[in-house]
Amino acid sequence: MSTGIETAGVPDAVIPELVIISGMSGAGRSTAAKCLEDLGWFVVDNLPPALIPTMVELGARSQGNVARIAVVVDVRGRRFFDNLRESLADLESKNVTRRIVFLESSDEALVRRFESVRRPHPLQGDGRIVDGIDAERELLRELRGDADLVIDTSSLNVHELRAKMDAQFAGDEEPELRATVMSFGFKYGLPVDADLVVDMRFLPNPHWVPELRPFTGLNEEVSAYVFNQPGAKEFLDRYAELLRLIAAGYRREGKRYVTIAVGCTGGKHRSVATSEKLAARLAAEGVETVVVHRDMGRE
């Protein structure tokens, strides 16, 4: 069946899935969008509703590179709402499948959230926060009625909302975890984005071995020296097992990214060799892993 989306001259055109995220300000639209992004969706924030059909057409022309599109729609005025209705009707006439996810919360929860960040509601004008909430709720009433999925976030924290989104959109796949393993030198300071820190200074320093000093932990002889030290292999085995446990917990909590910082004195020998070994272990467990040697070559 033809979809009506213009894909002339594009072989194997695939019409992307489309999810439209909308709802009350402060109800968790950004969190829902970030969850879909982490699940591999192409997310566009605050796209004018009139451009949604164009976005779908561009996705269809990507030859499968953009197979799932999520658009966050912030309806702040009647004209935007009318444009959204027109775009949805246009997509429906072209047989494009779309889902609307609507995020809502109680007045009390929304007031509490706006007060906690000390920001006004975008529609309150010179009135109170609750006035803005009332205006937005009335403006979105019809869209809420058209929603395929309504999520009330009044009593949900960020992790619980992510779990609900995962349940709807992750399918049977376990959420992926992406790890950055970063070697560093303590004398240059801790990485500010580290979630976990490993200190390899309990092992002898190859710096004091003249024939190894010029090389880095990427060198096979340096790596062999490090992991032939007493306790080195046992540490690697035990820490890899600990990471397996931590990774499972991160997935349950909806955490998608983790940075493991592995340090030694200068970030040249022990930390580099260990980072490479840990990254290989993580990759073997199915964790998408990137290795960064922050301070190598800095001395």
Swiss-Prot record:
InterPro entries: P-loop_NTPase, RapZ-like, RapZ-like_N, RapZ_C. One of its GO terms (molecular function) is GTP binding. Keywords: ATP-binding, GTP-binding, Nucleotide-binding. SUPFAM superfamilies: P-loop containing nucleoside triphosphate hydrolases. GTP binds at residues 74-77. Gene3D superfamilies: P-loop containing nucleotide triphosphate hydrolases. ATP binds at residues 23-30. It holds the Pfam family RapZ-like_N. Displays ATPase and GTPase activities. Belongs to the RapZ-like family. This is Nucleotide-binding protein SAV_6292. It comes from Streptomyces avermitilis (strain ATCC 31267 / DSM 46492 / JCM 5070 / NBRC 14893 / NCIMB 12804 / NRRL 8165 / MA-4680).
